[in-house]
Amino acid sequence: MTESEIPKEYNANEVEKKWMEKWNLSMYHFNWGEDTRPQYIIDTPPPYPTGNFHIGNALNWCYIDFVARYKRMRGYNVMFPQGWDCHGLPTEVKVEETHGITKNQVPRAEFRRMCRELTAGNIDKMRQTMLRLGFSVDWSNEFVTMEPSYFVKTQKSFVRMYNNGHIYHEDHPVNWCPRCETAIAFAEVEYDQGQTKLNFVHFDKVDIATTRPELMAACVAVAVNPEDERYSQYIGKEIEVPLFGQKVTLIADEAVEPEFGTGAVMICTFGDKQDVRWWAKYGLPLIKAIDKQGRMTKAAGKYEGMSIPECRQAVISDLRDAGFLYNQKPLEQNVGLCWRCDTPIEILSEPQWFVKINHEGILKAADEINWYPEYMKVRLQNWTGTMEWDWCISRQRIFATPIPIWYCKKCGEVMIAEESWLPIDPNENVPKKACACGSTEFEPETDVLDTWMDSSITALHVSGWESEHDLRLPAQIRPQGHDIIRTWAFYTILRSLALEGKRPWDSIVINGMVLGPDGHKMSKSLGNVISPEEVTTQYSADAFRQWGAVGGSTGSDVMFRWKDVVSASRFLQKMWSIYRFSMSHLKDFDPADAENFPPDSLYTIDRWLLSKLNRLVESTTKELDGYQFDSTFKAIRGFAWEVLADNYLELVKGRLYGENKEGRKAAQYVLYTTTRTLSLLLAPFIPFFAEEMYSRFDSASVHTRAWPAVNESLMSEEAEAAGEMIKDITGEVRRYKSDLGMALNAPLKKIEIYNTQIDTGDIAGATNSEVELMEGAPSFDYVPVEVKPNMGILGPRFRKDAGAIVKALKAEDPASVEAQIASGRITVTVNGEKIELEPEAVEIRKEVISGGREVDVLDIKGAVVVIVR
C-alpha cells in the first residue's frame, strides 16, 4: 500500500456515510439460543418519542454504545435493545396542540389513533439520528410500549401484582394537576421557589396564619403545639371558621411550629402533605372544596365555580371587609408544580389504584447492585426513606395502557381480566365471564396506567420475561440519567422484586445532564440548545462521540463546548496522518511476519513503544471495565499523539527510509502492531474512523474482532527507561538545534553520550548526526569569552552614562571581570572616572572546552550529552 492510495485529508462525512451503507446491522444482534458466551444485557432507556433525539439522549447513548461495542469485543453475547416509551401526558398534550382540540372533544379511539400516528412518525425521526451517530443498537429487539406485544406484558404485570396483593384500589389523597386533569406521582412533582403572602386571620378564640385562605371552606380542625401556653386553655374546644361558619376542634400536635405565623394553623382537606398526615392521624372529616378542574365546589358556598386564584382574592377581600384579616406578610415557599405543564398541583382525594411500596426490599436490592458512581445510590436511598404514600399508578388520561378492570353494575365488585384475555381494553371489550353475583353488566375502568408502569418492566422485557425465551434476569447494566433515579430506577427495582423476586440488574451507570456552552441547562428560552444533528453536519458523528467520551466522568454534568468538538475533529485528522504515514511504509510488510516476530530483532525504542502500548491496553481494559470512558479515551488519544506521533515516528524515520533492512523490518512490525491495535482500541469510541482504519488490515469488520490482549512478554520497565532516555536525548538535541535557528535535519559534527548504554542508531537517524557512546566521565574547562552587561540594572541607575559603561565593560578581559565578580565588586574606568558595580550588573558567557574542542553540554537526567561543534 502506498501513501498516495490513502487520501491526505480525512473526509469524515464521506467515510461515515460509506460505513452506514455498508454495515450489516445483524452483527449487533443478541443470540437468544447461545450459552457459550457470557450474556451482557443492557436495560436501555426508552425515550419519549418527541421526534427530537436531544443532546442529553445522545450523550447517554454514547455511553451505552461505548459499553456495548467494548463488551462484544471482549467476547460477550451483548443485547443493546432500543425501546420507545410512547404513552403518557407529553404525547397527549402535543396532539391537542397539533390538532387544536382537547382529548375530551373527540372519541376516545380517535384520540388514541392520533397519538399513535404522531408517535410512529417521531420514532422514525429519532431512529435516523441514532443511526447517524453510529449506535450499535440491536434493532431485532426493538420494543414500542404502545404496541400490544409490549403492553400485554404491562397488563400481565398488573394482573399478577393485583392477585398477589401488591396492587389495591382506594379513595385516597393524591397529587392532582388541574390543567392535565390527572393524578401524578410524587416523583413527578417539581418544586419552584415562589413568593406568596401569609395571611393573619381572627378566628373566634385564636388567630391563625395561612397561605391558603381559599381552603377555609375545607377547614376541619385547628392545630397548635401542646407546649404553646398561649393556646393551652383552648385545646379540645370548638372554634368557628369565619365566613363559612363550620365548627372545628382545636387539637394539639407536636408537628406545629410555635414560631411560625401565630403558632396556630388550619387543617384543611387538603393544603399540603402535613394536612393529609393530620387528617389520617385524627380521623378528621373530608370536605372537597376543589374539583378536578381546579374550580371551587359547592362546599365553597358563594365561591362555587371560581378558579383557585379567583377564590383566594375574593376570600381575602371578604375577610378584610368583615374585619377578620388583620395582617399580611410576604413569604417565600416551595410550590409543587406538575412536571409537564408547570401548573401548581393540588391534593385531592379520589378513588385511585396504588402499588404497595416495599421499602426494605428496595433498599436491600439497591445494596446488591453495583452503582457507578457509588455515591448515586444515596439518592435512591434518600428517596425511598421519604416515601410516605404508596405509588399511585392510575391516570385520568387516554393514551396509555388500559387498566384491565371492570366494575359490576349490580354489586360493585371488581372484575379483573384473566391473563388469557390480554391484551384488552375494557372500554372496547366486556369480560368473558359473569360476576360472582351472576350479573353480566359491567362498568369499564376508564382510568389508564401511569407510563412508569410500562417502562418499569423494561428490565424484565429485555431479559425475556413472558416470551418464548428463557428468563435471563438480572440484566447486566442499566444506564440512565441521575434525574430519574427516583422514578425509573426506583420503580424498576420495585417491580422486578414484586414479579420475580430478583434485582433487575447487576450494575447501574449514571450519567449527568448536558449543559449549554454558557454553563446553564439547555433550554429554548436561553437560546443555548445544541442538537446532535448540528454537530454531525458541521463536523462528524465521531467528533460528537469524542466529546461524549471526554466531556466528563460518569455521574457528572457535562458542558457542551464547541472547542471540544473542534479538538476532536483535529484528532481525527492527526490520527489519519499517523495512519497514512504508517501504512505507506507497510506496503512490503507481510502481516504473517507479525505472528512470530523475533523479539531480539527489536531496537530499544521499539521495545519502549510496545511496552507502552501493552500498558495502554492493560489500563484501558481496566478503566472500561469500570465505565471510566473519559480517562480511557484521553489515554488512547495521548498515546497516539504524544508517544507514537511526536516521538516514535520521528525516531524511526531513519530506519524506515534507510538501507538497514532488518532495522526497517523491526520498525514495520511495530507500526503494523501499533496501528492495528489502535484501530481496535478506538472502535468503541469512534466506530466509523476505526472501521476505515481496520478495513486495510482485514476484510471483516473491526466491530466483530476481539479486544486486544495484553502481551506481558513485551512489557518491560527496563525497556521503557532506556526508551525514555533515547527520547529525552533526541528531544533535547532537537531543541538545541531549534534554539540555534538550525533546521531539525541539519547535521551536527558529533554527539557524544556519557554514563549510559543505549542504542544510538535511532538517535543518529533522528538527528542526522554521528552519535558515539563514550566511556568514563568527560572533563570540561569553562573559558570566559564575553562580558554581557545587564541593562536592566545599568540603564535605570546610570541613565545617559549607561552606554559608555557598557562599552567599557565589553572592552574588559572576560577572565579579569570574572575574577572581580568572585571578589564581590567590579571596577570599570569610564572617561577617567572609576565606577564600582555590583556583580549582578554583568554576566560572563563561557565556552565549554573538552579535549581541546569547543562543545556544548546538554542537561539530561541520567546521561551527559556533549555536542561537538
Curated annotation (Swiss-Prot):
The entry's keywords: Aminoacyl-tRNA synthetase, ATP-binding, Cytoplasm, Ligase, Nucleotide-binding, Protein biosynthesis
Domain of life from the UniProt record: Archaea
Subcellular localization(s) per the UniProt record: Cytoplasm
Reactions performed catalytically: tRNA(Val) + L-valine + ATP = L-valyl-tRNA(Val) + AMP + diphosphate
Motif residue range(s): 'HIGH' region: 47-57
Motif 'KMSKS' region in this chain: 521-525
GO MF annotations, alphabetized: aminoacyl-tRNA deacylase activity; ATP binding; valine-tRNA ligase activity
Any one GO CC term of the record: cytosol
The enzyme's E.C. designation: 6.1.1.9
InterPro entries xref list: aa-tRNA-synth_I_CS, aa-tRNA-synth_Ia, Anticodon_Ia_Val, M/V/L/I-tRNA-synth_anticd-bd, Rossmann-like_a/b/a_fold, tRNAsynth_Ia_anticodon-bd, Val/Leu/Ile-tRNA-synth_edit, Valine-tRNA_ligase_type_2
Chain positions recorded as ATP binding sites: K524
UniProt xrefs under PROSITE patterns: AA_TRNA_LIGASE_I (PS00178)
Main location: cytoplasm
GO biological process, one term: valyl-tRNA aminoacylation
Function in brief: Catalyzes the attachment of valine to tRNA(Val). As ValRS can inadvertently accommodate and process structurally similar amino acids such as threonine, to avoid such errors, it has a 'posttransfer' editing activity that hydrolyzes mischarged Thr-tRNA(Val) in a tRNA-dependent manner.
Free-text domain note: ValRS has two distinct active sites: one for aminoacylation and one for editing. The misactivated threonine is translocated from the active site to the editing site.
Family according to the record: Belongs to the class-I aminoacyl-tRNA synthetase family. ValS type 2 subfamily.
Name of the molecule in the record: Valine--tRNA ligase
Gene expressing this chain: valS
